[in-house]
Amino acid sequence: MTLKTLTATLVASLAFAPLAHADITIGLIAPLTGPVAAYGDQVKNGAQTAVDEINKKGGILGEKVVLELADDAGEPKQGVSAANKVVGDGIRFVVGPVTSGVAIPVSDVLAENGVLMVTPTATAPDLTKRGLTNVLRTCGRDDQQAEVAAKYVLKNFKDKRVAIVNDKGAYGKGLADAFKATLNAGGITEVVNDAITPGDKDFSALTTRIKSEKVDVVYFGGYHPEGGLLARQLHDLAANATIIGGDGLSNTEFWAIGTDAAGGTIFTNASDATKSPDSKAAADALAAKNIPAEAFTLNAYAAVEVLKAGIEKAGSAEDAEAVATALKDGKEIPTAIGKVTYGETGDLTSQSFSLYKWEAGKIVAAE
């Protein structure tokens, strides 16, 4: 066979060969290690299950979806490193980050490199207030959930003494500031307003002050590691105050740390999506893997569904900006948390929060 004949044969064979599809890779930036790894596990489980279910049905635009994990350990610097890895790997879409303190710096890195992120859990208002076009969420904001908590206190603890404590982070301080604004506007001024440092174990100075001030309600802006310890130390001091917080107290690790002292703690979280028929397929897929259909897990599942919808609307996974624009067309997107629509900021156009309570290691409705 001559070289000319061989070349012609190869060209002909390539012309009739089926085109190979490139995988669509979604990066997951989450705390897979560290003190808030429990949240990372929930988000990873939700996102991976959604990817698996999508692939069972043919993928996105006929292409297989792959989830690539990047551990941020709940630390902003490590989050930036994870974001740079995602960018270096040529990934255009990200689920996460999980915590607001990590999500804000990561969003800047991703924006500079044309990567679209959908966070299932980062609730700080500042995340979507900075004019970035590449940030969306499948959760509400801290100002929304803190307002729900403050109105609950104004209604049920009128004329009682309130303390506000935060962990100095974007999430915790954001919650505390928003809670204070609504509380003060409603006529209650807190008697204690203090902060703790994540990683600290001894809150004796704070708990002693709370007891001496005869505080009835402690609003805590922060996550479960410190929240559980605070509950236990208040209980040990016989400071009979009700703890109220945000969705950072929704994890079972909060109960594991606080044990019985965590009983009666009230927290805000997204209204129960499992009550909607929209969540059934996701809940069934999770149940098949023995994974509870918890709020953060369903939010992560929904984040993958949002990316799928955006890519299909745009007709391609090549341009993340085009996908982001397509998602903000005002049309409903069916997800595991219900039908969602997005405004120009990347926030959900509607999001409801409910109040829950810890009782004997179980989460029940607070009202």
Swiss-Prot record:
Signal peptide (UniProt feature, chain positions): 1-22
InterPro entries the UniProt entry points to: Leu-bd (IPR028081), Leu_Ile_Val-bd (IPR000709), Peripla_BP_I (IPR028082)
Localisation per UniProt entry: Periplasm
Subcellular location, principal: periplasm
Highest taxon listed in the record's lineage: Bacteria
Keyword tags: Amino-acid transport, Periplasm, Signal, Transport
Disruption phenotype annotation: Reduced uptake of amino acids Glu, Asp, Ala, Leu, Ile and Val by bacteroids that lack this gene and the genes aapJ and braC from the two ABC uptake systems of branched-chain amino acids. Pea plants inoculated with the triple mutant bacteroids are defective in symbiosis; the plants are yellow, have increased numbers of small pale pink root nodules, dry weights similar to uninoculated control plants and 30% acetylene reduction compared to plants inoculated with wild-type bacteroids.
GO biological process terms on file: amino acid import; branched-chain amino acid transport; isoleucine transport; L-leucine transport; valine transport
Gene3D superfamilies assigned: 3.40.50.2300
Function: Part of the ABC transporter complex BraDEFGC/C3 involved in transport of branched-chain amino acids Leu, Ile and Val (LIV). Essential for the development of bacteroids, the differentiated legume-symbiotic forms of this bacterium, and for the effective N(2) fixation by them.
PANTHER family to which the protein is assigned, alphabetical: AMINO ACID BINDING PROTEIN, LEU/ILE/VAL-BINDING ABC TRANSPORTER SUBUNIT
Family stated for the protein in its record: Belongs to the leucine-binding protein family.
Quaternary state and interactors: The complex is composed of two ATP-binding proteins (BraF and BraG), two transmembrane proteins (BraD and BraE) and a solute-binding protein (BraC or BraC3).
Name by which UniProt lists this protein: Leu/Ile/Val-binding protein BraC3
Annotated source species: Rhizobium johnstonii (strain DSM 114642 / LMG 32736 / 3841)
